[in-house]
């Protein structure tokens, strides 16, 4: 199974805001970013499309399906809550500077195992991403799947495929409207490309 992971387009929010699972809308650059993405995706054929339920992903999936080149209708989009971004709990919609430095630093040193208050750990995010992969591959084995999701989830899946510690996640750049492709075949999953 090939998994083509698309990160949502840029957002209508200041860059210093922690947003995670908050349902933030897309920016004014949405149409231009979507067109560029559509061109990138036109090189591939897909058998199914999945998206996070957050509007920044759902909107993009709908817009991509509106172009007949993908071969999907909006009704073909399968929404899966396991594809959501990391839940930052009480930190959501606060500026990063508003989070007490001593608390943030402890979390930043072990975000794989520590959660923001009322949030989740990156390990929990990775586990739900893996559960999604296992479910989808059980009935779409050998197929090409398009997934519209978030940077944190894409990084967690790359870490899983490369068997790297989650501590190194933020060494991987995943830009808005970028494409990453992973393959789950046989015993050894592979990274085909990242942040294209």
Predicted regions, residues:
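Acidic, low-complexity terminal tails and accessory targeting/binding regions
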Residues: 86-97, 138-143, 159-196
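Extreme N-terminal starter segment of soluble prokaryotic enzymes
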Residues: 1-4
């Amino acid at each position: 199974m090939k998994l083509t992971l698309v990160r949502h387009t840029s957002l209508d929010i200041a860059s210093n805001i922690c947003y995670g699972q908050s349902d933030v809308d897309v920016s004014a650059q949405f149409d231009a970013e979507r067109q560029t993405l559509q061109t990138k995706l036109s090189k591939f054929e897909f058998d199914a499309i999945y998206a996070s339920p957050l509007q920044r992903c759902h909107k993009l999936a709908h817009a991509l399906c509106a172009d007949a080149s993908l071969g999907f209708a909006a009704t073909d989009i399968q929404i899966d809550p396991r594809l959501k971004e990391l839940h930052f709990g009480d930190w959501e919609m606060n500026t990063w500077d508003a989070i007490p430095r001593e608390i943030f630093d402890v979390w930043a040193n072990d975000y794989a195992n520590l959660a923001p208050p009322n949030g989740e750990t990156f390990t929990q995010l990775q586990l739900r991403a893996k559960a999604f992969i296992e479910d989808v591959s059980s009935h779409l084995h050998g197929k090409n799947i398009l997934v519209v999701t978030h940077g944190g989830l894409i990084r967690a899946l790359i870490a899983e495929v490369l068997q790297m510690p989650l501590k190194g996640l933020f060494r991987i750049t995943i830009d808005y409207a970028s494409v990453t492709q992973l393959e789950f075949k046989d015993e050894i999953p592979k990274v085909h490309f990242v942040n294209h």
